[in-house]
A protein has these predicted regions:
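Small-residue-rich helix-interface/hinge motifs
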Residues: 21-69
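Short pre-active-site segment immediately N-terminal to the catalytic Zn-binding motif
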Residues: 7-27
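Membrane-interfacial, low-structure loops and terminal tails that flank and connect transmembrane helices
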Residues: 1-6
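Hydrophobic transmembrane-helix microenvironments that flank and shape a buried ionizable site
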Residues: 10, 26-30, 73, 108-111
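Metalloprotease/metallohydrolase-associated module, dominated by Zn2+-dependent proteases
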Residues: 55-147
Length: 147
């Protein structure tokens, strides 16, 4: 019976860890956009309508040079990707490592797709769905190489 208890505990640990890192990732992602925008001299505001979603607004978005737009778009996801990869190197529990290694590439790919979106190269539905596919492939590869 203790085997089932251990499995149940790990499932609950994984679910709680997933939710917490998801919320933290959303917050850090949007703050990354805002901080890079402010560093480039633009006014920014971050809105979190729920723990599951957020967006960063720039009142002067239409007046920005394309390079600034691209840097701001890249910043959110790449900051989370780098932070989660570094954090996973120091994580000893299985649940945190699994979640961090899933969200790191997801945010990395999402940042690339955000650039494509602001360049009008992809529609919003692609931005909202497709980055999970390459992220899942990389996640499985990282899990396999970690043993």
């Amino acid at each position: 019976m203790s085997g089932w208890r251990d499995i149940g505990r790990r499932v609950v640990d994984f679910a709680v860890t997933f939710i917490l890192y998801y919320i933290f990732g959303v917050a850090l992602h949007e703050m990354g956009h805002a901080l890079v925008g402010q560093a480039l001299g633009w006014q920014a505001s971050v809105t979190y309508p729920s723990p599951w979603a957020g967006w960063t607004s720039f009142p002067q978005w239409q007046q920005m040079p394309m390079l600034d737009m691209v840097l701001i778009a890249l910043a959110g996801g790449l900051i989370v990707c780098a932070f989660f990869l570094i954090l996973s190197a120091f994580t000893e529990d299985w649940e945190s490592d699994m979640v961090l290694l899933f969200f790191a590439p997801l945010h990395g790919f999402y940042s690339l797709f955000e650039v494509a979106y602001i360049l009008h190269a992809i529609p919003q539905w692609v931005l909202a769905t497709i980055p999970i596919l390459p992220a899942a492939i990389i996640w499985m590869w990282m899990l396999k190489t970690r043993g």
